[in-house]
Structure formats: C-alpha cells, structure tokens
C-alpha cells in the first residue's frame, strides 16, 4: 500500500507561506512544462474553460508528477459535481458565486467526508492503493470559495464563520459587474472593495486569496492575502512582443 499524496498548496498555506497558481489554457503537456518552474499548484478551469469529467484524471495526473496541487474550478455549487471532481483526482476545488453562509456550508458538506461533511463515499483516484484513504482525505483536500458578487461582500462576516474552507478568494471581475461596472475590475471603486474584503478575511484569521499579476501581488500581500492565481497569457504576449522588437531592431 502507499501513502496518500500530500496537498502541497494546503501544506504551504498552513505553514504560513504564499501560494501562487498559474491559470489559462492547459493540457497535460503544458502542465508538465510548468512543473520545473516552482509553482505550488495549477488552476484547471471548469467554469469558463474546457476542463470536465473526461479530462480531469489526466490533467490532475500531470500535476501529480510534479508535486503541484491540481485545483479545479467547478461550474456550480452542486454536491455531485464537487465530490465527483474530487473522485477523479482533484486535490482542491474552487466553487464560484458563494454569496451566503448557507452556500458556504453546502460546499463543506459536499467536499468533506463525515464527520465534517457528507461527501459521497467513494475512493478517489488519489486514494488508489491507500489503505486508510477515508480517514486521511479530509486533511488533504482543499476547498476554495469565490467571493465574487457584491452580495457576498455584504455577507462576508457570516460567510467567514464557516470552518473547513481553506481560501476565501476575492474575484474582481464578476465583482465589478455586480457593482455596475462590467469589465471594470481595475476601477478604483472595485479595487477599494477588493482590498477591504481581503483585509476583513485576513484579520478574521482566515486565508484570503485573489487574482493578481506581478504589478499588484506585493500590494495584496501587504493587505494579508496569501493565495494568488494569475493568467500566464501576458507572459506569452510579452515574450512575443520582445521577440518582434528584437527582430525589428536587427533588421533596421
């Protein structure tokens, strides 16, 4: 028999470290290219992207090879969707649009085995060959809820009362829309709400996360956030731009 694979991102958060997670179009080969770059986890997109039950096993397996926590964002707060995603190999699940305490409690109920929750009793792909999987799984699974509506910000005190959620992630894009600013994540009004939510989460003793690129991550760390996802696509654009500039200079 073998030991249950450790959830690297969860361990690092529990150790007080910063966790950074690339997101964007992914396949197994691309995940492996991220492997040597030192990231804690990979964000597998099942709400706005093509990740589904057919490819979760192989995508999470690629993460396993490089000791990166596979984080799957599911498309809804649905018990069967959450526990089936864990069954197929996810070590962490991100659930969108958590706006109330009851919705947060539902995430825990779906994502944790008894006595914490009521996750369907089935051995995950992560549990293959693990003799005591059910007694260890709750310690190695990770739950992330998205605070991405203004109603969630207004209900944040009650949502933060829910235990067994690893990260309360403030998502600026949808938040901006619910504030009346579609596409306005960079507006000062939205940034103010995001920063206030991060302060409240971190001051409550819970872990705050958000979307942040190179320019903003230092500011959010100062506010107390410790979990960051970011798109790798700007790196691609910046690299392409630099290459084209170099070619143009060399041929002038």
Show where each model-derived region lies:
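Short, acidic/polar
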Residues: 23-37, 76-84, 150-162, 212-218
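Conserved anion-binding
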Residues: 80, 86, 90-163, 167, ...
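C-terminal helical cap(s) of enzyme catalytic domains, especially alpha/beta-barrels
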Residues: 59, 63, 101-117, 233-252
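N-terminal amphipathic alpha-helix/helix-capping segment at the start of soluble metabolic enzymes
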Residues: 1-23, 130-139, 195-203, 252
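Short, electropositive alpha-helical surface patch
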Residues: 218-235
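Conserved N-terminal beta1-alpha1 strand-loop-helix module at the mouth
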Residues: 1-70, 74-77, 143, 164-165
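Hydrophobic faces of well-ordered beta-strands that scaffold small-molecule active sites
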Residues: 19-23, 42-44, 70-74, 93-95, ...
């Amino acid at each position: 028999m073998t030991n249950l694979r450790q959830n690297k991102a969860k361990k690092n958060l529990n150790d007080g470290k910063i966790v950074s997670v690339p997101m964007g179009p992914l396949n197994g080969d691309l995940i492996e290219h991220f492997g040597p770059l030192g990231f804690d986890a990979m964000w597998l997109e099942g709400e706005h992207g093509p990740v589904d039950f057919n490819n979760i096993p192989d995508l999470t397996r690629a993460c396993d090879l490089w000791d990166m926590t596979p984080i799957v964002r599911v498309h809804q707060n649905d018990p069967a969707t959450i526990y089936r995603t864990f069954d197929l190999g996810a070590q962490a699940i991100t659930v969108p649009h958590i706006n109330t305490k009851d919705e947060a409690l539902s995430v825990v109920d779906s994502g944790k085995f008894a006595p914490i929750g009521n996750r369907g009793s089935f051995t995950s792909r992560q549990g293959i060959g693990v003799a005591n999987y059910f007694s260890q799984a709750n310690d190695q699974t990770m739950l992330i809820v998205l605070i991405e509506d203004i109603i969630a910000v207004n209900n944040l005190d009650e949502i933060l009362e829910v235990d067994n959620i690893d990260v309360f992630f403030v998502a600026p894009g949808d938040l901006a829309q619910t504030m009346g600013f579609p596409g306005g994540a960079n507006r000062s009004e939205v940034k103010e709400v995001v920063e206030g939510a991060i302060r409240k989460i971190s001051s409550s003793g819970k872990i705050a996360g958000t979307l942040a690129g190179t320019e903003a991550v230092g500011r959010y760390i100062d506010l107390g956030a410790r979990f960051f996802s970011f798109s790798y696509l700007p790196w691609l654009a910046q690299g392409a731009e630099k290459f084209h500039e170099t070619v143009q200079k060399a041929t002038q």
